[in-house]
């Protein structure tokens, strides 16, 4: 909730950050991701009418704005690129939806080619696995997409929904960017109220 997107210079010896510079007044920047070749930066603005901005990273570290498109929902909180770099995946927390944005040749973004709305009963307010005396609660008042990413093969896409206690799974058409729900379409969390947020793949890509 600061002024926007900042750039820093990193001291390679000490790790210290310096030369703080405001490069965009994009409100409530919630997530950043960089293309595999390091030439493009993507930033999500977690606002009601969510947007994603694309920036070209110049050799001197300066950013050049490419464009801005709708995130496909409200409150985008997570961005990730497919392994081939052709699509940007977006998780919209407030609306509980996910979207697929095509990446153009110059790194700019096109409007969403696919969007899916999470639906289902809200999960338990308190985690069933919480230790005795815990005050832990989760945002289980409806769907809240929290993370989205493709597996290392680029054939499948997974997304977590904190509010519904689910991990959704899709088949990805890498040419069109369309997502098709797998069978089953989702996996329930390990226990009620667990509120899945993030995941990682094994190095071999055969586990999550």
Briefly describe each language-model feature range.
Residues 36-38, 83-84, 152-153, 203-205:
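Residue-level detector of Asp-centered blade-edge/turn motifs that repeat once per structural unit
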Residues 9-15, 55-62, 100-110, 170-179:
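Short loop/turn segments immediately following beta-strands, especially the blade-tip
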